[in-house]
Amino acid sequence: MDYLSESLKLHYELRGKLEIQPRAGVSNKDELSLAYTPGVAAACLEIKDDVSKSYDLTRRWNTVAVVTDGTAVLGLGDIGPEAGMPVMEGKCVLFKAFGGVDAIPLCVRSKDVDDIVNTVALLAGSFGGVNLEDIAAPRCFEIERKLKERTDIPIFHDDQHGTAVVCLAAVVNALKIVKKQLSDCTVVFSGSGAAGVAIARLFDSMGAGEIIMCDRKGIICEGGDLTPAKAEIAAFTNKNHRTGTLADAMKGADIFVGVSAPGIVTDEMAASMAENAIIMAMANPVPEIMPDLAKAAGAAVVGTGRSDFPNQINNVLAFPGIFRGALDVRASDINEEMKIAAAKAIASLVSDDELNPDYILPAAFDERVGKAVADAVAQAARDSGVARI
């Protein structure tokens, strides 16, 4: 199928992938008076006296904003907020289909960090959570941080954290196959953007042995001429102060995680890794190294971002269930404990009998995923003290 042309036809036909359906009837005077004036005043006064009642008396409890500025949309780059709307609508469809979450796209016509933060913060009382989407680094880090400071609802940049959760789930199961512990592993990252940093932080929270982050210039190391964002990376990575190229970093490494550029890993670089290496080459549409080349070079398990190869790192395994769980307990945050719980829940859905080098993650359409992730995330929220009900 020619997905581009067929998708364009679908978009012209549907004129939007979302619509609003009323839950209250207004077919007669009494129904109208209950759903709207004068009866609605009773609900307004309840919320006036206790703002938390907005979760009980409106749809806020199940509603998430999907926010973009259109600066990093898929592989299309900075195409603007309006052009990003089809992607945001699609994301909202996935929220509903896989998590039962009502999501509303908000495309903000500004690239200014404070403009975006103020806009979303002022609207936060209408939502139970905010999913940031397709916002370019490094502004995405600052926007997320400032919104967390300004609001009391979960703020989650899926390009960072959704990718990190699914990648961690994949590695958890891959490590079972190669019989290694994450704490004993050297993990090399190619790409220091939003996803790379988030994955590295999550691996660090899980106790990874050594983390080495590489950008276009090579290994990131403390003491160099670093931007503030790179300095933050250097502070928790490369504890042995290694220097050199990506090829240097990969020598003897146990795990490679790529969120960078197509074809930058050669078969020689893959062959230089430790025995039974794990490679997650997630550049799209062309990975850092093709799976067949990686395996021929000695990699034991290979994952990519593509659906036509085994072991796709697909965010849809994570974000619907993560928000479902967070909303169910009215969480004030989505913290590291909740992300790790989500990753472990995803990994657990592949049984030991099923687990093999070409099957380390459940399928995107596996109906168990959303509930398993939601239940694990909700429990982690309770255990970590961010659940409010």
Kindly give the residue locations of the regions a language model identified.
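Short, ordered loop/turn segments at secondary-structure junctions
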Residues: 69-71, 79, 108-109, 134-137, ...
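Glycine-rich phosphate/diphosphate-binding loop of Rossmann-like nucleotide-binding domains
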Residues: 74, 79-96, 151, 157, ...
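Adenosine-phosphate binding glycine-rich loop
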Residues: 158, 181, 281-389
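Rossmann-like adenosine-cofactor binding region
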Residues: 232-301, 306-308
